[in-house]
Design a protein with these regions (language model features):
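Hydrophobic, helix-forming membrane-interacting segments
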Residues: 8-48
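Charged/polar helix/coil "stalk" or linker segments at domain boundaries
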Residues: 42-116, 158, 162, 209
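Flexible helix-coil transition and linker loops at the boundaries of alpha-helical arrays
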Residues: 47-49, 82-94, 111, 129-141, ...
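Conserved alpha-helical positions within TPR/SEL1-like repeat arrays
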Residues: 59-67, 93-110, 139-154, 186-204, ...
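Short coil/turn connectors between adjacent alpha-helices in alpha-solenoid helical repeat scaffolds
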Residues: 62-73, 106-119, 153-167, 200-214, ...
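Conserved positions within tandem-repeat grammars
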Residues: 116, 127, 139-142, 163-166, ...
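Leucine-rich solenoid repeat scaffolds
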Residues: 317-320, 324-343
Length: 343
């Protein structure tokens, strides 16, 4: 497994070279937790032993574990625990473990065996939802529905795009019945961000303008909660997604106007994604900015915008070196050379 830069990161993982809307996916997954050190007490009663051996920590601790590339280690614990915990005798704990299993499989899908791991994630989330009903556990229900929607959206990038996106929309709609802006602002914002990404993905196969406009509306809803002052990383994620969406919309109408909006959105993201704090997010966003300036050069101020594009690509290459990120290095270098030739 590749080592990550020893810099502070946002937790945002990119989906390889897939859709640009796969930004903030992992942070959009809700409700993960990690099991701490397993201490074995021999009391003769197996269930008592398991219950006393389990130590659940916070979502932040789970994120830190996964940030250390310990996804498979976490999954091993979840799987062992779920095989011992009774869904009947301790339903809530069982559902928590299944939800966390789903998060692990989702994250593993970013690394390997994409389709197989996404299908395992879906199965785990569906198992959790047998217990996490809207009536008994409304918040947990919404969390897992959001996770399920995100996973179906990811699966749509692999196969059966329309079919899986339909399932994603259904899951997000269920989550938003619980996650209202007034009562659950963070869940509302996360789900709106994910909903926007789903509409953007759908725009690739049908009703491009209409679905991109729906995506923009959803991202703007998310930004009503995800302000830079209160939730800077969520703000940056959604602004970057918004910038990508405006760039896509520029291919349909008002090219100059929508590209200008894209520039502004991406620049907002870069107020948070700095080179020192979030190098990978910085590089990805600088690459996006370079692409926007390259497109804008086709409309106005050709030399000026191409120069800005080259500078943005050069910034991205401060992170995307040939030795550490060869595929990104080659892609960004090719875009930069093209911009230089067009000047």
């Amino acid at each position: 497994m590749k080592k990550r830069p020893k810099k502070k990161k946002s937790g945002t993982l990119k989906w390889g070279n897939k859709s640009p809307w796969f930004i903030g996916i992992v942070s959009g997954l809700i409700g993960a937790f990690v099991v701490g050190a397993v201490l074995y007490y021999f009391y003769g009663h197996r269930e008592l032993e398991i219950y006393r051996a389990i130590s659940m920590t916070s979502l932040n601790n789970a994120d830190r574990l996964l940030e250390k590339n310990m996804v498979e280690d976490a999954l091993t614990i979840y799987t062992a625990v779920s095989s011992q915990v009774s869904a009947k005798k301790d339903a809530a704990l069982y559902a928590n473990v299944k939800n966390s299993e789903g998060v692990c499989y989702y994250k593993l899908a970013l690394i390997k065996n994409t389709e197989a791991n996404l299908l395992k994630a879906i199965s785990a989330f569906q198992e959790a939802l047998k217990i996490r009903t809207q009536e008994k556990y409304p918040t947990d229900y919404a969390n897992t529905q959001n996770n399920l929607g995100n996973t179906y959206r990811a699966l749509s990038e692999v196969k059966d795009k329309k079919q899986n996106l339909t399932k994603a929309f259904e899951a997000f709609e269920k989550a938003l019945k619980i996650f209202t802006r007034d009562k659950s602002p963070l869940g509302y914002a996360a789900t709106q961000n994910n909903l926007g990404a789903a509409y953007a993905t759908l725009s690739e196969v049908m009703d491009k303008e209409r679905n991109l406009n729906k995506a923009i509306k959803a991202f703007q809803e998310a930004l009503k909660v995800r302000t830079m002052a209160r939730y800077p990383l969520g703000y940056a994620t959604t602004q970057n997604n918004l910038g990508n969406t405006y760039r896509a919309l520029a291919e349909v109408k008002d090219k100059g106007g929508n590209l200008a909006k894209a520039v502004q959105a991406v620049k907002q993201a870069l107020k948070v994604y700095t080179l020192s704090e979030y190098p990978l997010d910085y590089a990805a966003t600088k690459n996006n900015l370079g692409n926007v300036y390259s497109a804008l050069a086709e409309v106005k101020d050709k030399e000026e915008n191409l120069t800005k594009a080259v500078r943005a690509y050069e910034e991205a290459l401060k992170v995307y070196t040939l030795g550490r990120y060869p595929s990104q290095f080659r892609a960004v270098t090719a875009s930069m050379e093209k911009a230089k030739k067009m000047r």
